[in-house]
Structures are given as C-alpha cells and as structure tokens.
Swiss-Prot record:
Disulfide bonds: none annotated. The lineage of its organism: Bacteria, Bacillati, Bacillota, Bacilli, Lactobacillales. One of its GO terms (cellular component) is plasma membrane. This is Membrane protein insertase YidC 2. One of its GO terms (biological process) is protein insertion into membrane. CDD domains: 5TM_YidC_Alb3 (cd20070). It comes from Streptococcus pyogenes serotype M1.
Amino acid sequence: MKLTLNRILFSGLALSILLTLTGCVGRDAHGNPKGMIWEFLGKPMSYFIDYFANNAGLGYGLAIIIVTIIVRTLILPLGLYQSWKASYQSEKMAFLKPVFEPINKRIKQANSQEEKMAAQTELMAAQRAHGINPLGGIGCLPLLIQMPFFSAMYFAAQYTKGVSTSTFMGIDLGSRSLVLTAIIAALYFFQSWLSMMAVSEEQREQMKTMMYTMPIMMIFMSFSLPAGVGLYWLVGGFFSIIQQLITTYLLKPRLHKQIKEEYAKNPPKAYQSTSSRKDVTPSQNMEQANLPKKIKSNRNAGKQRKR
C-alpha cells in the first residue's frame, strides 16, 4: 500500500510539474507560441523538425519521430539513473523486510492513534538507520531536468508550421487519430505490465490499478490532441519500454546481487528502539520522590529509640 501511495503521489507531482511547464508556453495575439521554455528549447526543436521535413525531404511525420528520438536518447541516462535509485531502494527494502516486519505488525495491531503514530515514527527511524529513503529513492532533480525537454518537444510537435497540414502513413497529423491512440495505449499498457513483472507478488496486487492508470491517461491525452503530438507520445512509449527492459533485466539483477553480497558480509541487525528507556511508570516516580522522606523518617525514629 505504501509503495502504491508513493507512486500515486509522484505521478501527481509529475503531472503538476508538466502543467506548470506547459503554462510557460503560451500564445501571443497572433497565435504564435511564446515563453522561456519555448524560446530556449521548443524553438530549436521546431527548427530541426522543419529541417528534417523540408531540407532533408523526410516529411513532418518522420521529422517529429527523429527529433523525439534524439531528445529522448539525450535524457535517457537521467531516466535510467532515476530507475536505478528507485530499484536500489526497493531491493534494500526486500532484504530488510524481516527487520521492519515487527514494527509493521505493531502499526497494524495498534489500539490507538497514539500507538500507531509512535510505531510509524519508529519505522521511519529504523529505515533511516538502515539507509532507506521512505520516498523510494525517487529524486526530484532528474524529473525536473527532464520535464522541460518533454514540454518543449510536446509544443514543438504541436506548433511547428506545416505539421497540421501534413500526413504520415495515411494519418492526418493535424487531426485526431483513433488508430494512433490505440497503438499508444497498447505501448503504455505493455510498459506498465513490464514494470509489474519486476516486483513481488504482494506489491503486484497493490499495483493493479496503476497498471491501467497510465494507458487510460495516454488515451485521453492522445485522442484530445492532433496526431502530430501523438507521434511524440508514440516514440515516448517505445523509450519507456526500453527503459523498463533495461531496469528489469539489467539493473535490478545487478543490484540484487550487489545488495545480497553487502548483507552477506554485514547482516542487518534488528532496530533497537530508544523509547523503552524513557518508559518510567508513575508508581516508580512516586516511590523515587518519597524515598528521601522515608529515609528521613527512619533516622528520626532511630534518634527517638536512643533517647
């Protein structure tokens, strides 16, 4: 449940960043794009689309595909680094499950909100002690670096002159395409399925809804926009599959082996909570407070006996 919640939160974060960046590309009074992202990234991409389409004679459809491939190839290392960090944290969590299991049981069996919060605080402390990032190791910096490129390419495919009046393999790039939308949905569904194959059965059950979230979102976005933009999402789908294949079959096995060797040399130890040291009952406090009085009364009784 926690992993699913983290994915939902970061999906919302990614969508929010995308909406923010798209707001940077507006239109002037003549309908032309403007904004910082467009000037520094979108306009050069639009130039290369026009170059491949007209100077190289490849047409706008193939030009969009080529420029998208170039852009996605350049930022692929950032995506792989992000996947590596998330996979590293996931593998560590799997190895440390026996360490965290007693605390998780206390969270589930808590009889009050105070007990639950105390156990959750202890779980976070135990995770920090073992080098676990509660957010799954998904850093915001790689995402922030990638989003301007995604946004710029998105608008370059939409606003480049000549795209809306061109065709590609019988598809009108200026209109919506049901065929292209179906292909895009299939690609992102396959990518979601691949990501589920890389996790345990327990996590797979929790991620079932996420398997359909991305394809449904892509259907909505692709069918509500011209096919020229759909080509951008199409190429992006292939790159998402490539990134997931590299993560599942190259990165995760290596990380699994690496972490297994690390914990074989230094086995993880059970987390020792310090809260129990502060657990002093009221009766003990009263006894300690009354101890000087008892000693004093005993001394007085001894003096009276001597007299």
